[in-house]
């Protein structure tokens, strides 16, 4: 299931787009396409758009590696993506339910993290109970 919601949030006027797809590599193209479309709205260069697409793909692949493979309560396991569009930046926050509370993302020195750090201006990760998330921010050059 894919769900897209666009809304204005708060007084700052940031646009927020929420997208949830089945936690499967087959659906990463949907997230890459959404990323490219939103980055184009901010007038990122073609190289910057491609960098963001690759970064989102890598972040999602890292999350899928530790995602739960069986749904809880009969629902489909989902990879959720929250895009926040400001005047000068795009922030992408992707989350998945964990296979177990002991699951961890790769170490910060890993090749995957080096790729993310090179492609995005800010990168952070959270593992909270039964959910893991990666946040990427790319700013438009002034």
Predicted regions and their residues:
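Conserved beta-strand-loop-beta-strand hairpin that lines the nucleotide-binding pocket
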Residues: 1-18, 62-142
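Bergerat-fold GHKL ATPase/HATPase_c domain
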Residues: 1-54, 76
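Hydrophobic residues in the alpha-helical elements that line and stabilize the ATP-binding pocket
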Residues: 59
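Hydrophobic aliphatic residue packing
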Residues: 54-56, 120
